[in-house]
Amino acid sequence: MEIILANPRGFCAGVERAIAIVERALEKFGAPIYVRHEVVHNKFVCDDLRAKGAVFVEELDEVPAGSTVIFSAHGVSKAVREDAEARGLKVFDATCPLVTKVHVEVGKMRNQTREVVMIGHKGHPEVEGTMGQSQGGMYLVETADEVAQLQVSDPLHLSFVTQTTLSVDDATVVIDALKQRFPEIQGPKKDDICYATQNRQDAVKELAGKCDLVLVVGSPNSSNSRRLKEVAVGRNVMAFLIDDAEEIEESWLRGKQHIGVTAGASAPETLVERVVMHIQALTGASVTHLKGIEEGISFPLPKDLN
């Protein structure tokens, strides 16, 4: 049996930055440091930060006035920012710069009096943050079927943006449907789906062609991790999304010769290592690393935390 590791996998630059912001704030200001929403969607990461003194909350009214709060990598609405300022909170923004780019795009589009269609998953915090960049003039769609039902005020002045962690293939289908229904619609100058999402999905496509089972390390509330599983399944390969090695069922491994392993952008490499060791303990499998893109991207921390 062979374990094949996808490349790239695991942490992206936005996740590394978000985690570093929480850790640096704890070092500089001490516990507790409040974080609005899970800073990244990974149970292992959040449990580790919680043990160090981070307190995760869903709404700012859970944060005592005058405290330090960090916005998660997924971004927040303008209303949340205004609320934080009104309550005198010291804010550090861990929003991924690639999500911020989408927020800026929405602002420019609305300033041009264009309505904006966002392609994304309803209820996801990134979508809520991006939709909250404008009071009105925005629509949310997830599928081509929803595009067919969409009614807008002015089809001639319409733009679209996307959630950064979508399936590239699924997003393309929805974008094509938008362009067919609204021929004058305009998109961003550069694709909103982030480099890490694209690279990890491409790596899984390669991996799926070499494996009869794919394990995606990531939490179930991680959008990009779920998309990786979907990409593998779309290549007609059995795939499972797991938080940690202990979730692996031995029955999955029976009769398999090549087991692919990857990780979502919010999953640390230590979890991948646990999965590899667990499979090796059960099967004695060898390990092969696929070649892939060397990303080499990093984002700076806020000045006050340097």
UniProtKB/Swiss-Prot annotation:
Q: Where does (2E)-4-hydroxy-3-methylbut-2-enyl diphosphate bind?
A: 41, 74, 124, 164, 222-224, 266
Q: In which pathway does it act?
A: Isoprenoid biosynthesis; dimethylallyl diphosphate biosynthesis; dimethylallyl diphosphate from (2E)-4-hydroxy-3-methylbutenyl diphosphate: step 1/1; Isoprenoid biosynthesis; isopentenyl diphosphate biosynthesis via DXP pathway; isopentenyl diphosphate from 1-deoxy-D-xylulose 5-phosphate: step 6/6
Report the cofactor remark: Binds 1 [4Fe-4S] cluster per subunit.
Q: Can you tell me which residues bind isopentenyl diphosphate?
A: 41, 74, 124, 222-224, 266
Q: Which GO terms describe its biological process?
A: dimethylallyl diphosphate biosynthetic process; isopentenyl diphosphate biosynthetic process, methylerythritol 4-phosphate pathway; terpenoid biosynthetic process
**Which amino acid positions bind dimethylallyl diphosphate, per UniProt?**
41, 74, 124, 222-224, 266
Reactions listed under catalytic activity: isopentenyl diphosphate + 2 oxidized [2Fe-2S]-[ferredoxin] + H2O = (2E)-4-hydroxy-3-methylbut-2-enyl diphosphate + 2 reduced [2Fe-2S]-[ferredoxin] + 2 H(+); dimethylallyl diphosphate + 2 oxidized [2Fe-2S]-[ferredoxin] + H2O = (2E)-4-hydroxy-3-methylbut-2-enyl diphosphate + 2 reduced [2Fe-2S]-[ferredoxin] + 2 H(+)
Q: Which UniProt keywords apply?
A: 4Fe-4S, Iron, Iron-sulfur, Isoprene biosynthesis, Metal-binding, Oxidoreductase
Entries under InterPro entries matching the protein: LytB/IspH
Which Pfam family is one of this chain's hits? Answer: LYTB
Q: Which cofactors does this gene product need?
A: [4Fe-4S] cluster
Tell me the superkingdom of the source: Bacteria
Catalytic site residues?
126
The GO molecular function terms of this record are: 4 iron, 4 sulfur cluster binding; 4-hydroxy-3-methylbut-2-enyl diphosphate reductase activity; metal ion binding
Q: Which HAMAP family match?
A: IspH
- This protein is called 4-hydroxy-3-methylbut-2-enyl diphosphate reductase
What gene, per UniProt, encodes this protein? ispH
